[in-house]
Amino acid sequence: SILDVGCAKGFMLYDFLQINPKFKVAGIDISEYAIKNALEEVKPFVRVADARELPFPDHSFDLSISITTVHNFEGEDLKRSLLELQRVSKNNRSFITVDAYRNDEEKKRMEAWNLTAKTMMHVDEWKEYFFQIGYEGDFYWFIP
């Protein structure tokens, strides 16, 4: 079973079902527009919900993913969204991508490119942050 937090119109869920139609998938997004206009094939599996308070029991999914979504949060909301993703995952099987940079040039590109992100950090700051809040899932960087 797979959960996509910040699924938008469900494109990734659709791809998972193309790989294996027997996969059990679910997706949430804060955008009513995105959910209303989701791909027909995944509409039964998506709903409007908040990443900071996922409407699923503990350990509900074999894998929970969130691709370039948590950058929309900061402070306590960022922490809550990451720990919620981990809470609904079995054996801490969660995967996220976050906006990151490794040097000043990448930071400038990131700031120019992503005008809506609330949280962008150096890769080392992200690692420290994950450790401090107890996030144990997998992660990868989006670096423009």
Language-model segments: which ranges?
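Class I (Rossmann-like) S-adenosyl-L-methionine-dependent methyltransferase catalytic domain
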Residues: 1, 5-53, 73-80, 94-144
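A conserved beta-strand element that flanks and buttresses the S-adenosyl-L-methionine
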Residues: 65
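Conserved helix-to-beta-strand junction in the class I
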Residues: 84-90
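Short catalytic micro-motifs in class I SAM-dependent methyltransferases
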Residues: 68-72
